[in-house]
Amino acid sequence: MKVLWAVLVVTLLAGCRADAEPELEAQEPAVWQSGQPWELALGRLWDYLRWVQTLSDQVQEELLSSQVTQELTLLMEDTMKEVKAYKAELEQELAPMAEDTRARLSKELQAAQARLGADMEEVRNRLAQYRGEVQAMLGQSAEELRARLASHLRKMRKRLLRDAEDLQKRLAVYKAGAREGAERGVSAIRERLASLVEQGRLRSALTSQPLRERAQAWGERLRGRLEEVGGQARDRLDVVREQMEEVRAKVEEQAEAFQARLKGWFEPMVEDMRRQWADLIEKVQVAVGASTPAPSQKP
């Protein structure tokens, strides 16, 4: 009776697996499409778990020899190492991000990373538990143990897929500066990206501007500079002209003063000489008149 019950359970589980497995398999390509190193490593782990889930004779043999858990441990370590490396690379790229935003995103990413690691750890522990149960066989048949393991593996693979997708989304958000909206506090990043886009658009417009327009702009600038220099030269010339007028006025004033002084010096001398000359002429005329004899009268 127990054997029949076990066969019935295995049949039902196999039917459930047949219904659930295509849905799970259909989701796989969307997970690893970008091909990041951590995704490729997780893909190898995923393929290995799919092979383990077949519970073939080889799988059973390797489960009992702990080879499966050892191989799974290596794949887990490789996956987590690639995740950490990719996260470190993103942190370097997003160093200019605001500290509070970067801390919030990093915390969310670490939580998703921890969930993925816990899922893989649970799978490994469950496989180790199965090996112990098979070795003990405490009142259970091998079919029952395999059925229970298959059921657990399906559930854990679904959980692993869900958490892997969540980690992938958060890494994409981290890489894009949290594009999912203001609820993640990334408005500053969007403003910075918008500013960079606007600067790029302006730079592109200036680069594609016709040469004639750019030459005209340079000509306007040069003309303005020449007018400025010419205005400064005219102002300087006016200052020099005013200074020359002041010098000329001073020279004329000094010349007039000197002329007045000369006139004051020589006019008395000239007047005295004129007076002396007039006296001399008068004396000569008197002397000439006195020496001339009077004319004789005839009878």
Swiss-Prot record:
Q: At which positions is heparin bound?
A: M156, R157, K158, R159, G219, E220, R221, L222, R223, G224, R225, L226
Q: Which residues carry this modification: Phosphoserine?
A: S141
| Pfam families on file | Apolipoprotein (PF01442)
What does UniProt give as GO cellular component?
chylomicron; extracellular exosome; high-density lipoprotein particle; low-density lipoprotein particle; multivesicular body, internal vesicle; very-low-density lipoprotein particle
PTM Methionine sulfoxide: list the residues. Answer: M137
Q: How is it modified after translation?
A: APOE exists as multiple glycosylated and sialylated glycoforms within cells and in plasma. The extent of glycosylation and sialylation are tissue and context specific.
Map out region (Specificity for association with VLDL) in residue numbers. Answer: 261-273
Q: Where is this region: LDL and other lipoprotein receptors binding?
A: 152-162
| Localization per Swiss-Prot or TrEMBL | Secreted; Secreted, Extracellular space; Secreted, Extracellular space, Extracellular matrix; Extracellular vesicle
Query: Quick check: keyword Transferase in the entry?
Result: no
Q: Where are the sequence repeats?
A: 74-95, 96-117, 118-139, 140-161, 162-183, 184-205, 224-245
GO molecular function terms here? Answer: cholesterol transfer activity; heparin binding; phosphatidylcholine-sterol O-acyltransferase activator activity; phospholipid binding
Please list the GO biological process terms of this entry: acylglycerol homeostasis; cholesterol efflux; cholesterol metabolic process; lipoprotein metabolic process; melanosome organization; phospholipid efflux
Key words, A-Z: Chylomicron, Endosome, Extracellular matrix, Glycoprotein, HDL, Heparin-binding, Lipid transport, Lipid-binding, Oxidation, Phosphoprotein, Repeat, Secreted, Signal, Transport, VLDL
Q: Which family does it belong to?
A: Belongs to the apolipoprotein A1/A4/E family.
Describe the protein's quaternary organization and the partners it interacts with: Homotetramer. May interact with ABCA1; functionally associated with ABCA1 in the biogenesis of HDLs. May interact with APP/A4 amyloid-beta peptide; the interaction is extremely stable in vitro but its physiological significance is unclear. May interact with MAPT. May interact with MAP2. In the cerebrospinal fluid, interacts with secreted SORL1. Interacts with PMEL; this allows the loading of PMEL luminal fragment on ILVs to induce fibril nucleation.
Instruction: Check the record and name the PANTHER family matching this protein.
Output: APOLIPOPROTEIN, APOLIPOPROTEIN E
Q: What does this protein do?
A: APOE is an apolipoprotein, a protein associating with lipid particles, that mainly functions in lipoprotein-mediated lipid transport between organs via the plasma and interstitial fluids. APOE is a core component of plasma lipoproteins and is involved in their production, conversion and clearance. Apolipoproteins are amphipathic molecules that interact both with lipids of the lipoprotein particle core and the aqueous environment of the plasma.
Put simply, this protein is called Apolipoprotein E
Source organism (scientific name): Erethizon dorsatum
Give the taxonomic lineage as stored in the record. Answer: Eukaryota, Metazoa, Chordata, Craniata, Vertebrata
Its gene name is: APOE
